[in-house]
């Protein structure tokens, strides 16, 4: 019987999150270019009769402090408005507006090919994503007076620019919305599903405000914090960002494109480098979506929306999970996290196991020999809710045993461990000689 001894760095790392804004996924430029038409002659401006606009009362016009809406709802009736009813199409649950550069039809041959968008396809796919989020996941409860969506449609804004833009959130604590450029719609797929996922995440808190289940909290700087649906960061007084938005928008989009949890290989590559970190760590905000598969397999698909809808400031998602499903027992939470991590070893999740790629199971943990043990390197030391997966070379016959010894927070690293501290891109920032000393026993 071969017997090896292994020191595991059971250390606790407090994760900080630095998303600039909830639901803001990506843009290739810092300032979003807008399509500003040449001022037409007054005689060329057309004004639409709002009484002839189907479902006009289902449109929430964003307040005047929002960019593009400074002149109010009436101005949108003009053909020269940036967002105009003359350049709009709608479906049962969505309005789509496009900028003037597209003309009357964003899919017309007169529009440069790189900027063409099939609006009918966009709306058709958006309706499918709506169905997924409402009927399958339960992110909004419609038809019972519990959601703004009973009386308003979500909003999509298409910008006339080649720079990549994909952002989902909402307006005025009331209605979900997304802003995209044509590249995200060629074809319409998981990117739009991801952004509509953000719109429904936003809708959770908007609906809580609508029903009175949540009340904004005034901050010292005059701003307000919405204490529901993770509309807050995990820093002091709700500062910072919430990587859970991105993790979940990924997972929500994969409900319609299940194979993409593996096909997007850049994400599982990031996961393999960072799974030892906190579940919500910013370094893997687009790649840490496996817990949601385990959660819904164990507790049912409705558990996903429960975490969102029943969250309470200042909880993070796992604290919400612990309260709902573990009777606030930290020991029970850790047992569940162990089960989750064990399933991650081979992606043993019924919903997606069939799509698994061998490259995605290339887990590794850097170890250093130290005093008769193998000690986990600082670069792979598990943070709170993170884990190590250490492959063993099993002989053809016989048994392999291991002795595990936990190390207290702040313990010394192995002598050969350089203690390299890295940033999100893997670049070295500094070095340490001890594991982090933050504890987590309550």
Identify the residue ranges that each predicted region occupies.
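Active-site-proximal alpha-helical
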Residues: 269-335, 339-343
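Zinc-dependent metallopeptidase catalytic helix centered on the HExxH motif
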Residues: 177-261
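Bacterial lipoprotein signal-peptidase II cleavage site
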Residues: 25-33
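Surface-exposed patches in mature extracellular/periplasmic domains of secreted proteins
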Residues: 134-153, 208-214, 235-242, 262-268, ...
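Zn2+-dependent metallopeptidase catalytic core
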Residues: 39-175, 179-196, 200-212, 414-420
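C-terminal motif of bacterial Sec signal peptides marking the signal peptidase cleavage site
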Residues: 20-24
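Beta/coil-rich, acidic/histidine-enriched accessory regions frequently appended to metallopeptidases
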Residues: 314-442
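Bacterial N-terminal signal peptides that target proteins for export
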Residues: 2-11
